[in-house]
């Protein structure tokens, strides 16, 4: 499988407390199959962050990769937008 065919997701980092691992929440909107109302869905993914560059609150792009641990199946591609520290 080539790299350009792998899934890429954009989400927000909700945890960076682990070494070389971040937790990313990806939010999507779908229509309800019967009623047609737009419903928000969110799912958490653990992603590999080799250099510990992503911080909590950042918007990041992650890409599907081989299994890196029992729960990690994604890796960090880039930090799209850094969080504003107040």
UniProtKB/Swiss-Prot annotation:
InterPro entries registered for this protein in UniProt: NA-bd_OB-fold, Ribosomal_uS17, Ribosomal_uS17_bact/chlr, Ribosomal_uS17_CS
GO cellular component, one term: cytosolic small ribosomal subunit
SUPFAM superfamilies: Nucleic acid-binding proteins (SSF50249)
Pfam family for this entry, one: Ribosomal_S17
MF-aspect GO terms: rRNA binding; structural constituent of ribosome
One Gene Ontology biological process: translation
This protein's UniProt keywords: Ribonucleoprotein, Ribosomal protein, RNA-binding, rRNA-binding
Keyword ATP-binding in record: no
Superkingdom field: Bacteria
Family, similarity comment: Belongs to the universal ribosomal protein uS17 family.
Reported function: One of the primary rRNA binding proteins, it binds specifically to the 5'-end of 16S ribosomal RNA.
Subunit architecture: Part of the 30S ribosomal subunit.
Protein name: Small ribosomal subunit protein uS17
